[in-house]
Amino acid sequence: MKIGIIGSGVVGPVLATAFLKEGHDVMLGSRSIDKKELVKWKNENETGSVGTFKDAAQFGEILILATGGSVTESAVRLAGVENFANKTVIDTTNPIAQTPPVNGVLKYFTNVNESLGEKIQQLIPEANVVKAFNSVGNALMYKPDFEGIKPTMFICGNNEEAKKTVTSILDSFGWETEDMGKIEAARAIEPLCMLWCIPGIAKGQWSHAFKLLKK
């Protein structure tokens, strides 16, 4: 598949490399194609391509939003709302506010009755937004190693076929997937990032993931 990734910070390049390893065609999009991190990624991944947000959005059959939450909506507009139509859009973002954590707890710019995932779906109504990859750090997004135990990735979205596609991707990346329903479930999934970050911010412990136990 052709994968267009919008965002070249700490998440985008990791996912771009992962998709290349899985045999996909990948374009990593950035606000600035001269960004040194983007040039470095291209030099290390010759089969991948780079471009602007708009280039990546036009290129991809599946699109990945991997920007900071506070700039995601502006990134979508730069990429061109029309370029998201009828595509599966994996939303990895979290609505993290630009203020320091309090006792290890991140602040969000959304309230409990809304989510960034919903805002994105409203901005690109013809796209099939699926929230995923937001509840774990970038180092564990691809082939996480927990001694044979698959961690759980919680997803949500309005389109069933899009969620099946994302579930297949997550399976190839080494994850167990739990579908939490429609996009409104992002109100519950996004705060998992807060919980995941507390051990890291407070104790420097970042090598963990969530697991849903069932019987």
Q: Can you describe what each PLM-predicted range is?
A:
Residues 93-139, 143-144:
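Rossmann-fold NAD(P)-binding glycine/threonine-rich loop
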Residues 23, 59-61, 127:
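Short, well-ordered alpha-helix to beta-strand connector turns
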Residues 1-42:
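NAD(P)+-binding Rossmann beta1-loop-alpha1 motif at the extreme N-terminus of oxidoreductases
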Residues 44-88, 94-102:
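Rossmann-like NAD(P)-binding element
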Residues 151-215:
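Active-site-lining helix/loop region of Rossmann-like oxidoreductase modules
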Residues 50, 90, 128-134, 178-180:
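General beta-strand structural signal in soluble alpha/beta enzymes
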Residues 68-71, 135-137, 159-160:
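Short beta->alpha connector loops
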